[in-house]
């Protein structure tokens, strides 16, 4: 059997919206399957460049990378070929843009309060990225977002670990 190897990159994009910390998700299909924005690394692109490009294309939003989060690998079958896909995920901060400007590859891009984002994500490995992102923000302190955000992160971590 043939095996095809694929490399993708994507991001967990966060923003503060009033008293909430929000994550940017993409939705496909009906009913919606929610996931993090990601896509193939193109020729001569770094993983970071691909992650930023895919976030911009799939969500209509610009972001900046704060940190590498994790690599996720999984297997799937397509057209009688076995695929191994590795995805490099980054923690990102929202800069600008409008989710209405997402591209045709997704049906919807939307902001979710961080706990709702974790609940709505389809894939367990992506749910874990929410935890990793919150843990990173808590450890790094307030320099990445406004001061009040650390309290939101701590509260979200407590709620998520209790559920």
Regions of interest found by a model, annotated:
Residues 1-36:
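N-terminal strand-loop-strand
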Residues 15-20, 38-42, 80-81, 154-159:
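Short acidic/polar alpha-helix capping motifs at helix-coil junctions
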Residues 16, 95, 135:
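Residue-level marker of positions within ordered structural domains that often coincide
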Residues 40, 51-53, 82, 136-139, ...:
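Short, charged/polar low-complexity linear motifs in solvent-exposed/disordered segments
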Residues 41-128, 159-162:
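Unchanged
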Residues 119, 124-163:
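Charged phosphate-binding loop/patch that engages nucleotide di/tri-phosphates or the phosphate backbone
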């Amino acid at each position: 059997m043939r095996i095809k190897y694929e490399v993708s990159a994507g991001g967990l994009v966060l923003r503060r919206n009033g008293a909430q910390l929000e994550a940017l998700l993409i939705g496909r299909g009906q009913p919606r399957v929610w996931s993090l924005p990601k896509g193939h690394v193109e020729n001569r692109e770094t993983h970071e460049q691909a992650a930023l490009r895919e976030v911009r294309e799939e969500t209509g939003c610009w972001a900046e990378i704060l940190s590498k989060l994790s690599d996720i690998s999984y297997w799937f079958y397509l057209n009688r070929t076995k695929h191994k896909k590795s995805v490099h995920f980054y923690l990102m901060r929202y800069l600008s843009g409008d989710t209405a400007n997402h591209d045709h590859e997704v049906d919807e891009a939307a902001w979710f309060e961080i706990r709702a984002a974790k609940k709505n994500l389809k894939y367990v490995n992506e749910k874990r990225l929410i935890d990793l992102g919150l843990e990173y923000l808590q450890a790094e302190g307030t320099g990445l977002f406004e001061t009040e955000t650390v309290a939101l992160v701590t509260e979200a971590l407590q709620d998520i670990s209790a559920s």
